[in-house]
Amino acid sequence: MMSWADKYRPKNIDDVILNSEIRKQITEWIESWKEGIPKKRSLILYGSQGTGKTTTAYAIAGTFGVPVVEMNASDQRNRDSMRGTALMASLYGDLFVESAKRPSKVILIDEADNMFERGGDTGGIYELSKIIKNSANPIVITMNDIFEFRKKNYASDVISASLTIEMKQYGRKLDKNYNEFRRNIKARLIFILKNEGYTLPDQVVDRIIDRNMPDIRSMINDLEASAVSGTNISDQSSRDVPEIVYYMVDKAFKRNYDDTLRSIYGSDIDDSYYVSWIDENLPLKTVDLQDLVSAYEVISYADHILWAMERRRHYELMAFPMEIAGGVAYYIENMKHEYVKYQSPSYISQMSKTKEKRHAMMSLALKIGLLIHMGAQRTSEDLWFYSLLYQHNEKLRTFFEEKLNLTQGEENVLTRSE
């Protein structure tokens, strides 16, 4: 059972809700590839979250009729691979085949403004500029803050080689673009309702739009929740996440899978958060040990898919972990039917208690990483070693204190103090 947001995701650029000026620029860029390799081989889409940058990139690929090869620039493994043009070529085959008659793929560089935040680490941006210069395939680069990206070395080379479009659908409310954008959104929502066999009052649809503007995916999620459940989601002043997930967990344990799926698709709850809630409350709902073992096997499978999504970037698996975890009640033969007060995942309260310490560890890793020209992730793995040196080598301790401007929390990490 696919969510409405996924079911009605734009397949090509004509399906994307854009103002006329943005649509014209993107369409002209797509058309320029039909005449050979254009001067501007890459397209930069920038703007706040929820404005459809990534959706537009996939719609562009759909218009070309080719797949997307996605690299998330904020991911450390992909940042490192960006440094080597030869490695990119080996990974993506005909990326540099100038003789290609038409594009064979769209290269998506997502969240490029998060690329190489460490000072002086600009090799990847330089390599990206070379890739743009030589690519035989369209490249779409998304970023939230182009002005922050401009400050990085070689960023100007990337920007000058690209067509740059701000994904801002309107300047202010009630201007021409705002009215056009709103009309198009409302028409799309009404079309979805009609296609799914539901109706909602006009004022409810209007409130859903106003509540989520300009995030279309959230609008469709609220539309589905309101239509299917018969409740007016738009009347809620804010999404009370603990209350919503409590309701969703209760649905999962009542063995009505259709209701469970509706609660999942009608929410913005993160997959891992939902799975964690189910996992935490299994002992409260099971009587027999064997039932608990069977239920944990289901959660283990959902957890494995979460790992594949987060570590291997298999985002096509999104929603599967929730769908799997949501069916766990069918593996519990003897379930407690009396009232149970569901518990928030224990790791969340533990994370809250250790928040300051974790923040100190990360800031210390960043400082040491800058000093020794190493990534924060790798440095954080070696903090135990720097802690030993700090405690037993007076010269290094003095050096760290002079160079790192340590906070009390960072010093506590190095001295292993609580």
From Swiss-Prot:
Stored SMART domains: AAA (SM00382)
InterPro entries: AAA+_ATPase, ATPase_AAA_core, P-loop_NTPase, Rep_factor-C_lsu, RFC_lid
Molecular function GO labels: ATP binding; ATP hydrolysis activity; DNA clamp loader activity
Gene3D superfamilies: 1.10.8.60, P-loop containing nucleotide triphosphate hydrolases (3.40.50.300)
SUPFAM superfamilies in UniProt: P-loop containing nucleoside triphosphate hydrolases
GO biological process: DNA replication
Coiled-coil intervals: none
Keywords tagged on the record: ATP-binding, DNA replication, Nucleotide-binding
Binding locations of ATP: G47, S48, Q49, G50, T51, G52, K53, T54
Self-association state and partner proteins as the record states: Heteromultimer composed of small subunits (RfcS) and large subunits (RfcL).
HAMAP family for the chain: RfcL
Role of this protein: Part of the RFC clamp loader complex which loads the PCNA sliding clamp onto DNA.
Protein family membership: Belongs to the activator 1 small subunits family. RfcL subfamily.
Protein name (Swiss-Prot/TrEMBL): Replication factor C large subunit
Organism: Thermoplasma acidophilum (strain ATCC 25905 / DSM 1728 / JCM 9062 / NBRC 15155 / AMRC-C165)
Top-level taxonomy: Archaea, Methanobacteriati, Thermoplasmatota, Thermoplasmata, Thermoplasmatales
Gene: rfcL
